[in-house]
């Protein structure tokens, strides 16, 4: 593999960082509630593991904050100094179902996807049923992430809306201090 960045790689990193940073803000400012165009409401929350990054080259700094019941103060402080989220653990909830997934900003790589537990009714079940349900749950999770990303792009690509969103994000950061 080449060390030369592919065309658009730097844009992807910035867009990914802006997305995860916006997602953290929106998940707290909107109590984690999102809605699909079909009207399905779901919750999306940043879990207790966030990594923020800022700077370039040799002055690149990364801070990772994790811990049960952590308020993520150090990561929020990093945001207020210009860092952006570069990795986050997300929790998605719909009704009684819960998914968790780790997302990297640089390439939207998803790791450690955990789906809701699949209930086994009995030994007479179709052997493919559990597999197909697992695939359905994975696709559902990815669909929710795609929807939130679509909402982000709608705001991000409208300059006036993005400026308003930046103001709201700064107010959110100031309120958290």
Report the location of each language-model feature.
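Intrinsically disordered, low-complexity, charge-rich terminal extensions
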Residues: 1-177
């Amino acid at each position: 593999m080449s060390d030369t960045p592919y065309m658009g790689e730097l844009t992807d990193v910035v867009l990914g960082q802006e997305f995860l940073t916006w997602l953290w803000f929106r998940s707290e400012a909107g109590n984690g509630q999102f809605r699909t165009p079909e009207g399905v409401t779901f919750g999306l929350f940043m879990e207790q593991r966030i990594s923020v990054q800022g700077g370039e080259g040799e002055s690149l700094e990364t801070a990772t904050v994790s811990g049960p019941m952590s308020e993520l103060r150090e990561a929020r402080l990093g945001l207020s100094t210009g860092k952006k989220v570069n990795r986050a653990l997300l929790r998605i909830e719909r009704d009684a179902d819960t998914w968790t997934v780790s997302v990297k900003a640089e390439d939207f790589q998803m790791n450690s996807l955990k789906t809701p537990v699949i209930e086994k009714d009995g030994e007479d079940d179709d052997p493919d049923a559990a597999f197909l349900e697992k695939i359905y749950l994975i696709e559902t999770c990815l669909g929710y992430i795609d929807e939130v990303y679509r909402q982000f792009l709608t705001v991000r690509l409208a300059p006036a809306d993005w400026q308003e969103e930046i103001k709201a994000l700064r107010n959110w950061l100031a309120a958290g201090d």
